[in-house]
Amino acid sequence: MAGRVGQMKNQDEVHQNQILRELFLKELRAQKLYTQYHVNPLRKVHTITRKPMSWHDNLEEPEDAKFLNLIHHAAQGPKKKYSETQTEAQEIGWDPNPLINPDRQDHRLNHFRVYHDITLYKAKLWSLGEDDHQK
């Protein structure tokens, strides 16, 4: 019985070696050695910013008119950029003109501050320094 266990162990080692060899060959088939390197054109390249206080980097560069127009266009408000609203949130306040002409003489909607004798008396007391505003 002990001999059989030894034989099983040897068969397992051979079998393991065969599995490892197959894995190694499969990896070698899938591997590709890259010797030429290039930048991926589909990926955005991050630029390295210069130091603002260095004198050698602050040389005058020609203005890019297209880039300046793009910056000025982005800084404008949405009403100047677009003829119509782009989102539902922009619909509120897009047209600031009132729908009806407000009549300031109509007392149904306009409640202006009106001074009578009692309100003038209390306002005078408050201006003189009376502390109890609640009474």
Curated annotation (Swiss-Prot):
Origin species: Mus musculus (Mouse)
Pfam families named among the record's database cross-references: FAM183
Family: Belongs to the CFAP144 family.
Keywords: Cell projection, Cilium, Cytoplasm, Cytoskeleton, Flagellum
Organism superkingdom: Eukaryota
Subunit structure: Microtubule inner protein component of sperm flagellar doublet microtubules.
Protein name as it appears in the record: Cilia- and flagella-associated protein 144
Cytoplasm found in the keyword field: yes
Induction context: Expression is activated by FOXJ1 and NOTO.
Annotated segments matching region Disordered: 76-100
Entry comment describing in which tissues the protein is expressed: Predominantly expressed in tissues containing motile cilia.
Tagged with keyword Transferase: no
Compartments in which it is found: Cytoplasm, Cytoskeleton, Cilium axoneme; Cytoplasm, Cytoskeleton, Flagellum axoneme
InterPro entries in the record: CFAP144
GO cellular component, one term: centrosome
GO biological process, one term: flagellated sperm motility
